[in-house]
Amino acid sequence: MEIGVDIVEIARIRAVYERSGKAFMNKVLTAAEIEQCLAKPDPAVSLAGRFAAKEAISKALGSGIGHKLGWHSIEVLNNEAGKPEVTLHAPHLSYRVSISISHDRHSAVAMALVQPL
């Protein structure tokens, strides 16, 4: 069992989102994640939460985003109750992932717990 934590400034993510728009979202999020973020009153807050979640998961896996794990290898979607759930789209990763995401006006934070299946 491993854990990972990440925190990001919402203003930083908002600036990147406003500067590059969908290009940044397409790089970091899956189509389903983009749909959920854009459905929110302030998509930048949801985007920051997803970004922090993916970073926290990559830290828990010990790989980081890049060489072995891409942004689209991790999908974080809210279920009907609003709870974030993780799907790993990488055949070499057999893990159960639990994630918690929170934010205030300034920051989004995520904590991931990964367990081998």
UniProtKB/Swiss-Prot annotation:
Main localization (coarse): cytoplasm
BP terms from Gene Ontology: fatty acid biosynthetic process
Enzyme's top EC category: transferase
EC number in record: 2.7.8.7
GO CC annotation terms, alphabetical: cytoplasm
Gene Ontology MF term list: holo-[acyl-carrier-protein] synthase activity; magnesium ion binding
A Pfam family annotated for this UniProt entry: ACPS
Name of this protein: Holo-[acyl-carrier-protein] synthase
Organism: Chlorobaculum parvum (strain DSM 263 / NCIMB 8327) (Chlorobium vibrioforme subsp. thiosulfatophilum)
